[in-house]
Amino acid sequence: MLNKRPTIFFDLDGTLYKLRDGSYSQSPLKRYVLKNAVFYIATRLAVDKPFATKILDKILVKYREQISIGVEKELGLNRNDYFQFVWNIPARLVVRKEKNLRRNLLDLRKYYRLIIISDAPLVWVKNVLVALGVYDIFRNNIFSGEGNNRKGTKNAFPYIIKLLNLRPDRCISIGDQENTDIIPAKKLGLKTVFINQSQKSGHADFSVKSINEFTNLLLNIKL
């Protein structure tokens, strides 16, 4: 039997919070991740940091942001070990908390099932949600990037919808990346909301600038 309760899929980075210095590519978070990744490779392979840096550079060329997959396939290292080592970063160093976030989410939870869907590892997702003061809201509804069902490989939404027996037309996906948060979700029949402070989406059903605006928008979305 299909679960008819309306559901909201929240992306994490860039959606529930904004990174300091804007995008991931410009943020301290990326610098921490790359620094830790070099140290991880050097430690696990027993090589010096310059050589570890060369290894990482080759992985970045081939796998781009999917470093964990590259580390596993190219170096034979455990993906979860990589996540725990590299991504256990204090979120307070890079996260900008949005005003009234907790209140808005608690209001939404009265009517919707709230789910986090992120390709980031669970250790980072938990660190962020704790820093934002909303971990208890999502505690049992977190889908992170340790496994093979990821937004980046376009199979996360189908997997979760089947697992939870959801009706796609009773679901909303909100995120800041069209290629992973909007287009795949819309193809499955979900309502989609693009969040960006300065741009609108040509693919999403709606565009908003903040979670505050998204909360108000839901009054106009019929599921």
For each feature predicted by the language model, list its residue ranges.
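N-terminal helical cap/lid subdomain that shapes the substrate entry/recognition surface
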Residues: 2-102
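Asp-based, Mg2+/Mn2+-dependent phosphohydrolase catalytic module
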Residues: 1-8, 102, 106, 112-223
